[in-house]
Amino acid sequence: MAPKPPSGTSLRAWDAVTPALSEWVLEAMSSMGFTRMTPVQASAIPLFMAHKDVVVEAVTGSGKTLSFLIPVVEKLLRLEEPIKKHHVGAIIISPTRELASQIYNVLSSLLAFHPPSAAAINPSEDDDAPRPKFPSSTLKVVPQLLLGGSTTPAEDLSTFLKRSPNVLVSTPGRLLELLSSPHVHCPQSSFEMLVLDEADRLLDLGFKETLQNILRRLPKQRRTGLFSASVSEAVDQIVRVGLRNPVKVMVKVKGGSGVDDKRTPASLQMTYLTTPPSHKFAALKRIVSSVQPTPLKTIFFVSTCSGVDYLSAILPLLLGDDFLLIPLHGKHQANVRQKNFNRFINSHDPAILLTTDVAARGLDIPSVDLVVQIDPPSDPKSFIHRCGRAGRAGRRGLSVVLLHPGREEDYVSFLEVRKTPVVPFSPSISFSDADAAAATATARKAVLADRALHDRGQKAFVSWLRSYSKHQASSIFRVSDLDWEALGKAWGLLKLPKMPELKNFTGDKTLGMSLDWDNYAYKDKQREKRRKELLQEAAESGATQSTSNKRRATESVAWSQQAESKNKKLKRREQKKSKQEKARWEKMTEEEKQKVLETEKMVEELRKKNEEERRLRRAVAKAAGAKADGDDEEEFQGFD
């Protein structure tokens, strides 16, 4: 039985943890402003430190990161001897680059209070003040951050060989790259702990194969921790990641009735606003202006990357100069994502991050005051994660989800059943058709100035419709209920896109616009020149009726049916090829078959040998400070 804390000591005091935390950890918590543990930390840290596998489900913003970082650090610093060179003691896996970076930064901040680790992480330069030196036998924690897009796998391996880190913080794809090297070791004698942060997303089918390949390279005798805001929805998959009799920790929030009925922080107020489609974007200015004091950090969530690209050009015109709008989505280049993320984090003026669900999970964006879900998420699980960007660590926050009148209002009851209740937005906001018309005119003025923006709008609208049609709550979000003309005008479109979903639409597809499309130009001179050339070529050659009919026939097929047709063709092609190979094999003599098998075996062995030699050459070259030629590795783009 664990000893009880001294009389008068709060169970959530850092010095009440059993087994006791190191003095330098207590000093770090005090210096970082954490006066006492959060409920999830008070529950999870003692269990994880006591060699238990843990499954931790707690509301977003509840301090889960320190719940696993402190046990990992304490475990590695209490070993009998240092971990061997090029051996790994702990791994922390995150679904996104941004979240992995934040975990690494928190870990580095913590280790700054442990002199041996701090010296290993940031060795002194010639012009720096001399740092104390520690013998090689001194226990220390040396982390390495692995991110696709910022470094190549060869550079990661070179850093690993040079610094010999014992803790890896990584996204799944880049981690698997490193663990595939024969120079990286995770034997049972060295490896201690595995942490899966945002575990339900890591256990999603999209990451299943990568995760399984990683787990095959790790010893089964280890401590494993799963941390997330909604672990319960992935519990049936926990066995697959090798937990042994895990202890489940669930930390919920009491609602007004005093019953544990909420899955979000008590400091977060979740609301909804019902607005007609034509007023949707015009309402955004009213929302951010009505919140007092003015929110310094706001996040707007939309459903698609194309939507971010288009609305990042339109919304600043509607919001005015009072807010800095910054786009962020998963298809941005890694350096662009990091740059925009840092701009938002470091902005001293009111800023709005326009993003997709790439920013909905795990990111600890400090001081977010307001979250607006312009598009309700296709996956209801994402709703809680989006809202949870505000109201973190006890800070007051507000979230608003925009709904169309009618059937979409049933989403309120749907959320109530899922224990994420929302209340009407207050103060109430009134709209007029004149406000909506003015917003449409402002957006269209920008679109008319550049045909490229029109193209982006058409693409974004189609992309939004596809996402809308995939809502898991399909009985609430129905394409057949959409008001096409109102939506098109709200988006600032000059016409509705050609979509099979509009095949039976009898309204005004031009949205009341009359435009000379032949003379509607791109701002980019090269692009406009090319458009005119194509227009001239089409006029001179003339499109044949059969070609025109064929194109129209293709357009009349829904995008989902087109994708299904392509998949069927590919499957038939593969089946045909397989039959041909089988027939050729059956015609061979036994001697011929044996020769083929021997040849294939030799080719495979040679391929593996060459690949290993290339990996080794690159690693050695990088370790020596040289740049290996032909080292153009594909960058891992992360998860969206």
UniProtKB/Swiss-Prot annotation:
Bias (Acidic residues): 630-640
Record motif DEAD box, residues: 197-200
Domain comment quoted from the record: The Q motif is unique to and characteristic of the DEAD box family of RNA helicases and controls ATP binding and hydrolysis.
Location of the region described as Disordered in the Swiss-Prot/TrEMBL record: 531-593, 607-640
Domain Helicase ATP-binding intervals: 45-249
UniProt source species: Aspergillus fumigatus (strain ATCC MYA-4609 / CBS 101355 / FGSC A1100 / Af293)
MF terms in GO: ATP binding; ATP hydrolysis activity; RNA binding; RNA helicase activity
Gene Ontology CC annotations of this record: nucleolus
Listed name of the protein: ATP-dependent rRNA helicase spb4
Binding site for ATP: 58-65
Composition bias, Basic and acidic residues: 577-593
Residue ranges annotated as motif Q motif: 14-42
Compartments in which it is found: Nucleus, Nucleolus
SUPFAM superfamilies to which the protein is assigned, alphabetical: P-loop containing nucleoside triphosphate hydrolases
EC number annotated for this UniProt entry: 3.6.4.13
GO biological process: rRNA processing
Keywords assigned: ATP-binding, Coiled coil, Helicase, Hydrolase, Nucleotide-binding, Nucleus, Ribosome biogenesis, RNA-binding, rRNA processing
Quaternary context: Component of pre-60S ribosomal complexes.
Protein's job: ATP-binding RNA helicase involved in the biogenesis of 60S ribosomal subunits. Binds 90S pre-ribosomal particles and dissociates from pre-60S ribosomal particles after processing of 27SB pre-rRNA. Required for the normal formation of 18S rRNA through the processing of pre-rRNAs at sites A0, A1 and A2, and the normal formation of 25S and 5.8S rRNAs through the processing of pre-rRNAs at sites C1 and C2.
TM ranges: none
Catalytic activity annotation: ATP + H2O = ADP + phosphate + H(+)
Domain Helicase C-terminal: 283-437
EC class (word): hydrolase
